[in-house]
């Protein structure tokens, strides 16, 4: 192989564009032609003595678990937006390099599509854009999460029909009505999976006198959490460990799924009110489409047992949970990159 051939091969092989679902709890990265290559926690390990970024994602979580006194865990995104710019930039850069390392300095940087909450301010949008460019993007595009989720779930977003999406992530619940390649009306509620975890922890502290951490609360939600009785008619229970509220000594208790349901009632009902308010802003023709086609429930929070049935009862509209709820957003971002017409029609509109 000649040196020219070597340069051409190296350049072409590295010219890959990326989609990033920059979430409060997890970050997913997908590459054109490859699909999803990274799905890791949105956490960064910072050395306490020097304040240096040492690791991100799974590696950061493992370091902190093994040597908690030496490192601190930073979650650079809160409620779906950047809380610490420098740490976010470092995290994005690390994930970009891990997904597609640049082996030669002349290799082109990737174009990157990043999702943002539909309620993000212009300052918050600018922060995501700048962080992505500084982290190594040749060009950066922003797309609102509900639009990306709808595309990832193969909803007819460019057609003259109304589609409604409820995307429950770690930090925000995004609600949007989509038609003709644009978001007709939308809203963003900074209440989502993390707040459900907090509600569980607070309720168990008050009910059983036990203090638990956020990881334990999340496990409880996933294993025995529900907002309606389980369809098989059987309730669940689970043994958990924590600290006694009064003595701070180790404590182990058995909790019931009914206890978790009580904890989740108030925040879920707040979501219902939010969805109803967004639907009220929809024009009659699109509202008719939504009533006929149903509402897409997506995001990790959308997987809570019984949530689709509960929303359907409260809204009096069919609600269905996507089979790919965890990956719809990043898949939709990737679809935009792989479809030139979508890149022009949807991304340019969202500038």
Task: Please identify what each model-predicted range represents.
Residues 1-168, 176-295, 302-351:
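Nucleotide/phosphate-binding catalytic cleft detector across ATP-hydrolyzing
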């Amino acid at each position: 192989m000649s040196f020219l051939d070597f340069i051409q091969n190296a350049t072409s092989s590295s010219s890959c564009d990326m989609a990033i679902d920059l979430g409060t709890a997890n970050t997913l990265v997908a590459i054109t032609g490859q699909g999803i290559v990274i799905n890791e926690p949105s956490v960064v390990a910072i050395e306490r003595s020097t304040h240096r970024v040492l690791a991100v994602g799974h590696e950061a979580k493992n370091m902190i678990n093994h040597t908690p006194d030496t490192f601190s865990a930073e979650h650079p995104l809160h409620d779906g937006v950047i809380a610490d710019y420098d740490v976010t930039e470092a995290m994005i850069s690390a994930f970009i390099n891990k997904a597609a390392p640049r082996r030669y300095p002349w290799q082109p940087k990737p174009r990157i599509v990043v999702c943002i909450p539909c309620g993000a301010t212009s300052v918050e949008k600018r922060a995501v854009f700048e962080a992505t460019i500084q982290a190594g993007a040749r060009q950066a595009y922003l797309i609102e999460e509900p639009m990306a989720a709808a595309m990832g779930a193969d909803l007819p977003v460019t057609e003259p029909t109304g589609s409604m999406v409820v995307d429950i992530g770690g930090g925000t619940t995004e609600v949007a009505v989509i038609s003709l390649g644009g978001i007709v009306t939308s809203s963003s509620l900074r209440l989502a999976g993390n707040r459900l975890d907090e509600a569980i922890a607070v309720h168990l502290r008050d009910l059983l006198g036990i203090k638990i951490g956020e990881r334990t609360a999340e496990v409880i939600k996933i294993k025995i959490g529900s907002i309606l009785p389980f369809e098989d008619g059987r309730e669940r229970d689970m043994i958990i460990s924590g600290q006694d509220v009064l003595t701070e000594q180790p404590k182990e208790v058995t909790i019931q799924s009914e206890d978790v349901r009580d904890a989740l009632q108030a925040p879920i009902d707040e979501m219902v009110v939010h969805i109803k308010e967004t639907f009220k802003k929809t024009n009659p023709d699109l509202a008719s489409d939504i009533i006929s086609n149903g509402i897409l429930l997506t995001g990790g929070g959308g997987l809570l047992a019984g949530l689709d049935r509960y929303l359907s009862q409260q809204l009096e509209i069919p609600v269905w949970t996507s089979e790919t709820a965890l990956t719809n957003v990043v898949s939709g971002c990737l679809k935009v990159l792989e479809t030139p017409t979508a890149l022009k029609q949807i991304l340019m509109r969202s500038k």
